[in-house]
From Swiss-Prot:
UniProt region (Disordered), positions on chain: 1-22
Protein name, as recorded: Transcription antitermination protein NusB
Function (record text): Involved in transcription antitermination. Required for transcription of ribosomal RNA (rRNA) genes. Binds specifically to the boxA antiterminator sequence of the ribosomal RNA (rrn) operons.
GO CC field: cytosol
Annotated source species: Rhodopseudomonas palustris (strain BisB18)
Amino acid sequence: MAEMKKTIDNKPAPKGEKKANRRGAARLAAVQALYQMDVGGAGLNDIFAEFESHWLGNEVEGDQYLPAEQAFFQDVVSGVVRDQAKLDPLIDVALAKGWPLARIDAILRAVMRAGAYELEHRKDVPARVVVSEYVDVANAFVEGEETGMVNAVLDQIARQFRADEFSRG
């Protein structure tokens, strides 16, 4: 019997629910966690405990949160925290001139940091999928030009880290 991936809610995936849905939920949760750490100053252990026990897979203020792949969520959040000093300059270079990362809204910083981390470290996920997923996450919070900016920044970073994927077509 195949081993099931653990999720933040520790429940097996319902029949027909795709791993991608749990990864998408993990990405959204990771961005929310990174945002909360950025603006609220919460620590990594506190964030993990809060999200794993109170948010994911539960109903909060009338919204049902999807279960998320725990290992993926933790990898993205802890990886961004660990590598932020390396990720931020990459994002700064990819941003339009005159728009330093510090000037970008905190939620978009979280989206771009998570996407940049995944592009550099999660080679198991195709670059185009990573970019598309984080544009979708950005769409959950903002509209219009800002999602285009996320797409442009992550596309540039993807081409830097995964040029071979783009040369194949």
